[in-house]
Structure formats: C-alpha cells, structure tokens
C-alpha cells in the first residue's frame, strides 16, 4: 500500500512538473500579415501591404518589421538610436532583440481630390479579443524617450535629439495632401499584448472634401485587417505555435 502511495505521489509530482514545464516559455509573435478577408475596395499586395483605391486616390498601409525599420530609420546606420526599434540591443543572457512598437507605413497618392487630409492620431487598432490600442503621437514618443534619458547632458542628450529628429521627419504628418501629390510616413502603436492574433487598423475621418474654411464636409473611414501567429518557447528559434 505504501509503495502504491509513493508511486501515486511521485506520479502526481511528475505530472505537475510536466504541466509547469509545458506552461513555461515566452510568447513570440510572427510578423503581421494581411488577413485573407478584406473590406470592399481593398487589394492585398505582394509586399504584404493593403491598398484602398477610390478612383485615383490610393491609400496603402503596410506593417513594418524591425529589420526594415533598422534599415530605413537608423541615423547614419546607427541602429542603437532608432526611435522605432531596440536596434541591436540584446538583454544579458538572451540571444534576440525584442520588438519595441508595431509600426505601419502609410502611403497616400492623391490624384482624385483637390486635397485630402489624414490625421494619424485618429487611427486605432481593434483586436479580435476586444483590446483597443490608440496610436502614439510625436508628443507621446517625445515624452517616452525623454523619460528614458540616462542623463540630461552628454551622450543621453545627443541620442534623445537624434531620435526625436528622426521621428519628426518620418512620422506621418496630418498635412493637406494636394491633388497630384503623395505622402509617406509611419504610424506607431503601443506594443500589442501576447494574446492578440487578429487586428483591424482603422483610419478614421479621412477628409476628402472641405468647405471654404478648410473644414471637412466629406470623409471616409477605412479598416485594414491583419493576422499573426503567437509562438511559445524559450527563444524565438525553438518557439512553436501556441494553440
């Protein structure tokens, strides 16, 4: 009877240990990709972007990877001061670099209306599990990096200026996009939670017609849908899909 009890206890301990081991591990998200189903008027492109066409107005949204952002937005090739990523920073004891923000490239080609205006601050991410994320404005990111200064002088100040200068040049601006012209820039959101697999990126109140005081009298709302998988493991290399 004692041997049976010992076997039961040892089996229970082993089972609990197995549960703990299987439950351990970190979550790693795969890059966002366009969902199969999109709203009317949307076209999924080979580069992973989605384009909405309204006659000769084209609005394209594309999720960016950290590798792409490091190539596009690293001053003088120095990834350590990239405002959109952690650059080449690897935490002690780890072999990979975490993602800092979800970043989308927004491109507009206006050959249809006298002028168009998109305010990126009016955008929003809605997740399939009902989480909602508001965009990060220049002011939000300015305060974020100011709070991360190592010091108010010296190298910390130089890196802060490099980052904010890059943000000022590359964030999508809410300027008028006049007929025959294009606009290009990034829209940034807070890091998505680990349980988020499907998202809708909404561009709201896109103004396409204005009155004589430049107040919008006609606007449209667009929704771009993206998916990603969530992997679990100790490192990105050994992570598997988490069902």
Q: Model-flagged regions — what are they?
A:
Residues 1-24:
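Sec-dependent bacterial lipoprotein signal peptides
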Residues 24-243:
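Conserved functional micro-motifs across diverse proteins
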